[in-house]
Amino acid sequence: NARWNLVEQAWSMGISRNLVGVEFDEDNQLLFTRVNARRVDITSCRDSLNGYQKGRCFYCFKPISLVPGDAELADVDHFIPWAARQEVSNINGVWNLVLACRCCNRGVEGKSARIPELRLLQRLHTRNEYFIQSKLPLHETIVLQTGQRPEARKSFLQRNWQAALDKLIHTWKPNAEGEATF
């Protein structure tokens, strides 16, 4: 029933059901999401993610836009890169998605398939906790994807970050483009 509620909520918010499809692992007693090993459309969550980022790139704080066709249209980025999808649980989960400027996501000096440095993982944890505490519609999804307690959620992020780092090896640090706002 909780899984169906998440899907209904996603539809009402215009978010792709692929971002909140929750399955149950009987052996490990875990809820998880998976869409085979293929990419799914994750751009439907721009507006929801912007509730925290308030028009700024998650990495460098440069102003971003949510208007389709705008030169500064935000990319929806996998914080832990898609390239680590075999090592990371539910890579398309909302817990792992952030809004990024094009330079940070795919520019010459951008993140691409590198792992954001550890201090940015703390920023992601803070962002996820914000969604959970604010009781915004994404809060239940993030709890189901990452854990019931803050310690479990932090451990989930750390485990996945380390698994991705073990595979991809290289970390990345953004250049500040604006004042830190979150």
Language-model-derived ranges and their functions:
Residues N1-R34, S112-F182:
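Extended charged
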Residues G14, G21, G51, G55, ...:
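Residue-identity detector for glycine
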Residues A2-P63, A83-I91:
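Short, charged surface segments at domain edges that flank catalytic/cofactor-binding sites
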Residues F61-L97, G110-R123:
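Histidine-centered nuclease catalytic patch
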Residues R56, L97-A100:
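Short pre-active-site segment immediately N-terminal to redox-active cysteine/selenocysteine motifs
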Residues F61, R102-N105:
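Cys/His-coordinated zinc-binding microdomains
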